[in-house]
């Protein structure tokens, strides 16, 4: 799924602690720019994933502006479902990418974001019954709890994710709904992760 990073200039949208920035450099990237809105995360990224080829910038990805053809690879890990205007950002991303450039991203799966609560339904004994999927075709704002705090996310259908790329001239190269690997099935709760997808991975080319 990952592209060849050798001598590439990379933009990481929603870079968090900079793990993917470091990965890009490890794989031979010439330069990596990590962008995130969280000052705390960027401070930590500077501590644990600092490198002469990595720079960090604090900004909302929707507010970013770069010249056309600035990057060979643009990636985003579990951040785009926090963006309200996905089509406008995709249009920018295509402009920022060089010809044949790669756009690679992961988001929470639309099945996972549809209902909003992002939690299982349990019986009176606390046993899992099922995972709720409701209001799937009603796109827009959802309130969820993440690490004990209420956060706002934006639900989109799978069709919207794919067609937004296609309408903006991207070529879809790969789409993956990752399942837990077999060697993790003995871990507590892991078998339940086979009951619904949690993430969606997409790779497209300009």
Where are these regions (language model features)?
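Acceptor-substrate binding/catalytic loop of class I
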Residues: 107, 111-120, 145-160
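A short SAM/SAH-binding and catalytic strip from SAM-dependent methyltransferases
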Residues: 72-87
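Conserved class I S-adenosyl-L-methionine
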Residues: 102-140
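Short alpha-helix
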Residues: 152-175
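Class I SAM-dependent methyltransferase SAM/SAH-binding core
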Residues: 9-64
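Core SAM-dependent methyltransferase catalytic element
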Residues: 168-170, 188-206
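A short glycine-rich, Lys/Arg-flanked "PGG" loop and its adjoining helix->strand segment in the class I
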Residues: 87-102
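A short acidic, Gly/Pro-enriched loop at the edge of an enzyme's catalytic core
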Residues: 62-73
């Amino acid at each position: 799924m990952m592209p060849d990073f050798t001598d590439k200039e990379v933009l990481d949208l929603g870079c968090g602690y900079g793990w993917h920035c470091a990965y890009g450099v490890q794989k031979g990237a010439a330069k990596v720019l990590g962008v995130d809105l969280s000052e705390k995360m960027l401070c930590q990224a500077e501590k644990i994933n600092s490198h002469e080829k990595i720079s960090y910038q604090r900004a909302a990805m929707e507010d970013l502006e770069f010249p056309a053809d600035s990057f060979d690879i643009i990636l985003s890990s579990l951040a785009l479902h926090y963006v309200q205007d996905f089509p406008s950002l995709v249009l920018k991303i295509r402009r920022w990418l060089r010809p044949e450039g790669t756009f690679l991203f992961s988001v929470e799966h639309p099945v996972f974001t549809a209902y909003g609560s992002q939690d299982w339904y349990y019986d009176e004994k606390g046993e899992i019954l099922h995972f709720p999927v409701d209001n799937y075709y009603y796109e827009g704002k959802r309130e969820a709890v993440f690490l004990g705090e209420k956060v706002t996310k934006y639900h989109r259908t799978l069709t919207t994710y794919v067609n937004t790329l296609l309408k903006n001239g991207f070529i879809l190269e790969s789409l993956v709904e990752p399942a837990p690997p077999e060697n993790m099935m003995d871990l507590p709760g892991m078998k339940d992760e086979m009951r619904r997808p949690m993430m969606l991975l997409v790779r497209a080319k300009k």
